Amino acid sequence: MKDMISDIKSKKPLVHHITNYVTVNDCANVTLAIGGAPVMADAIEEVEDMVGIASALVINIGTLNSVKVKSMIMAGQKANELGIPVIFDPVGCGATAYRREVARLLMGKIHMRVIRGNLSEIMALAEENIHMKGVDAGSENISQVNDLLKNYAKQWKTILAVTGAVDKITDGQRLTEIENGCKEMGTVTGTGCMCTSLVGTFVAAAQQDAYDATVEAIMTMGIAGEISWKQNGNKGLGHFHMGIIDEIGKMNINILKEWGRIHEI
């Protein structure tokens, strides 16, 4: 395991977010907490200039409108042109036809270096993009799910980070499982979005090692949640929520090594 957190703190990479207004403050704060520099600009008049000075672009479709979609496409294509990694969070993409249409549009126009979502979101992407029908998102056949995820990563030429009770990261060849985190993280709005922002920050600082950067980012979020719940769970969800950001700010390679539960498949 590499000490990517120290690299982030020394480089202070600028991470450009076009994200949703429900969780934008938390996304900015976790980026700052781990050592990055967030900017949350979505005006179509400036996104190309902003992404041009960034080290990564995070696109999150949690709250959509037609103007923001145009900004996402413009920023994403500029990032691709400049070799800046794009991290995509297809929030709720299976919930409505509009979300599915936008996710499909973005995937067709922008190369995503990393896609971070839960299993149902990834399955919704797969149905639209590679026409694999009838996949049970709740399947207990772990081997089948792992094979599907590897196939999706190959098809999309991306690193796929699927978060849940057991997090799975694959580039189509390797597959890493992480068993950190706690179920209580689902009681706080935005932990998935925060996780995606961490992925963007880690990848921004380690662009040539995006796979390991993604793994360490997912571990960081899970471990921060575990520690915060242990320390703050009896104080209420507000303390738990803020505690996650506190623990991200205190995270280091030694904590990752001590708390990390990770294995290769």
Regions found by a protein language model. Name each.
Residues 1-40:
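Glycine-rich phosphate/adenosyl-contacting loop at the front of the ribokinase-like
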Residues 124, 189-219:
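Short, small-residue alpha-helix embedded
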Residues 68-117:
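Glycine/small-residue-rich loop that forms an oxyanion/phosphate-binding "nest" at active or ligand-binding sites
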Residues 30, 34-83, 88:
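Active-site cofactor/substrate anionic-group-binding motifs, chiefly glycine-
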Residues 178-189:
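Short pre-catalytic strand/loop immediately N-terminal to key active-site residues, enriched for Gly-Thr
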Residues 223-265:
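Charged C-terminal helix
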Residues 100-175:
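Conserved phosphate/ATP/ADP-binding segment of small-molecule kinases
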Residues 148-153, 210-225, 244:
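Short, well-structured alpha-helical segments that form the helix of a local strand-helix-strand
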